[in-house]
């Protein structure tokens, strides 16, 4: 059975591997730009959600922007009969833009309050376990509106806890924690994106902030499925997320960790085990596009990398700097 960890100073006990749910909504596009991970039939999405429950996953991370709300809709429909046994994490602040880009950022009080109401409806629930801003604050006005919205959301019982998804804006994450604005912080961290996190982890421990790792498989680049030279189709958001040089550089880096793969563990399992080797981490939230892939991810909860392997990983990462 998958292990559980406490989410910071909250009273939430989360499966140390959750399910990132971006892909569950299927294909969507804005201004001819894909904002999904390709097609996914609703039946496949429901099969993955049901399998997650069977495997012991109790935490599902989504956002109102994911497939323009369809990820939330599918989750709400599939999980409404077991609401008390699971945790819904969702996010707001990324807004579909029909001008010259796929999205804009809106962290205003009115937008966040309206967004959580829409998410509650799509998720078919009367409360959300963790409501997060989806983008980092850009100004003092943003910090102020976030504080006001989070206070209202909690006092009205619409969310039990509030947090921020800051991607790789680590200093912003530290500032949010020091101001006492967040119960959790979601950020990027993986074998090929190791990041300087010692200060952030130290502040999180001091403030009791739960750490959620997004993209622990680097959007699939650590699964072993994609080799240097791979090009994602236009229907996949990854086609637009990276220029080709950066994509190929990340894929080349991923090949340096093949020594972690053996008959007892896959590339994905090794990558997730690396994340879970950090006690500061409460949960990582890889996505999955099949039940088979999901089951493989869950098995990482039973794997531990050796001290020698962790040291070799550290040496490889330091050589990149």
Regions found by a protein language model. Name each.
Residues 61-62, 75, 88-90, 164, ...:
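Hydrophobic residues in well-ordered beta-strands that form the structural core
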Residues 26-31, 95-102, 293:
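A short acidic, helix-capping loop that chelates divalent metal ions and anchors anionic groups
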Residues 120-139:
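Active-site groove signature of glycoside hydrolases
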Residues 39-52, 107-123, 168-175:
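Short, acidic/polar
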Residues 137-321:
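Beta/alpha (TIM)-barrel catalytic core signal, keyed to glycine-rich beta->alpha loops juxtaposed to Asp/Glu
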Residues 33-44, 70, 103-111, 141-145, ...:
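Alpha-helix N-cap and loop-to-helix initiation/capping positions
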